[in-house]
UniProtKB/Swiss-Prot annotation:
The keyword Ribonucleoprotein applies. One of the primary rRNA binding proteins, it binds directly to 16S rRNA where it nucleates assembly of the body of the 30S subunit. With S5 and S12 plays an important role in translational accuracy. InterPro entries: Ribosomal_uS4 (IPR022801), Ribosomal_uS4_bac-type (IPR005709), Ribosomal_uS4_CS (IPR018079), Ribosomal_uS4_N (IPR001912), S4_RNA-bd (IPR002942), S4_RNA-bd_sf (IPR036986). It comes from Pseudomonas fluorescens (strain ATCC BAA-477 / NRRL B-23932 / Pf-5). This is Small ribosomal subunit protein uS4.
């Protein structure tokens, strides 16, 4: 399955919520009518079945983190095999992806841009270049922009944008050195309350 490269507003309208696919310079509502379904006429949303609600929640989370269907299924199996709540384990695995950590630290303005930085070998982990977006970052790991990329305008702008919206508490960043520490894996209470992971667990449990 190919990665989606079409209009980001279309996905936000499909899920009826901000998926944080845009930089956040302007509020998503000023760019996308997320209350309306996709299409020219933005037809009214019909009443969903339980299955439809569960599926939409899975698609929403998958699109927020930019993960393909097969990858997402793999993360779920991994989460189900770990101790603790499967839904929380799933979100933590997604949060520990390198492209997501790069985004959380503010080196990329979106997760898609952060994924590109990783793929283009602009990011190092503990001093070693890593170009795999799905690489699992561990507590205490140092994630940094490599010397060759430190002066890229998009990284400078992304850091400014992150300073405006605020940085999450589980990362610590030196903006001058463009380096940060992944202090700890976030607890469920640290993550978005707009995600209902129990619906995803129900979907995969069928």
């Amino acid at each position: 399955m190919a990665r989606y490269i079409g209009p980001k507003c279309k996905l936000a309208r499909r899920e009826g919520t901000d998926l944080f696919l845009k930089s956040g310079v302007r509020a998503i509502e000023s760019k996308c009518n997320i209350e309306a379904a996709p299409g020219i006429h933005g037809q009214r949303r019909g009443r969903q079945s339980d299955y439809g609600t569960q599926l939409r929640e899975k698609q929403k989370v998958r699109r927020i983190y930019g993960v393909l269907e097969r990858q997402f299924s793999g993360y779920y199996k991994q989460a189900a095999g770990k101790k603790g709540a499967t839904g929380e384990n799933l979100l933590q695995l997604l949060e520990c992806r390198l492209d997501n950590v790069v985004y959380r630290m503010g080196f990329g303005s979106t997760r898609a841009e952060s994924r590109q930085l990783v793929s283009h070998k602009s990011i190092s982990v503990n001093g070693q270049t890593v170009n795999v977006p799905s690489y699992q970052v561990r507590a205490g790991d140092v994630v940094a922009v490599r010397e060759k990329a430190k002066n890229q305008l998009r990284i400078v702008q992304a850091l400014d944008l992150c300073a405006q919206r605020g940085r999450v508490e589980w990362v610590e960043v030196d903006t001058e050195k463009k380096s940060g520490v992944f202090k700890n894996v976030p607890a469920r209470s640290d993550l978005s309350a707009d995600i209902n992971e129990s619906l995803i667990v129900e979907l995969y449990s069928k």
